[in-house]
């Protein structure tokens, strides 16, 4: 199982830089021999500043008017599935 450390920085009420989240994220199950980890998401463009962790949202392949930043790992021999969406992809 893929483990990823995610560090997200932001600003406090005084405008100083802070670490908002420093967490280990585990991959979510997908199809056979495929793993994914959601790193970040936005629900609008331009993106709004959020106080909640967007990886806890109900994320699909894409978000209407937003974006999903996802790390995907395919094991050797697995046929990838490319798709087309009207979305911002990282």
Where are these regions (language model features)?
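Short acidic, Pro/Gly- and aromatic-enriched capping/linker segments at domain boundaries
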Residues: 1-12
């Amino acid at each position: 199982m893929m483990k990823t450390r995610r560090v997200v920085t932001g600003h406090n009420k005084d405008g100083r830089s802070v670490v908002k989240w420093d967490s280990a994220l585990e991959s979510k199950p997908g199809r056979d021999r495929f793993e994914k980890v959601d790193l970040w998401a936005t629900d609008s463009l331009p993106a709004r500043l959020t106080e909640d962790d967007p990886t806890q949202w109900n994320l699909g392949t894409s978000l209407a008017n937003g974006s999903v930043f996802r790390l995907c790992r395919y094991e050797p021999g697995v046929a990838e599935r490319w798709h087309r969406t009207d979305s911002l992809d990282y």
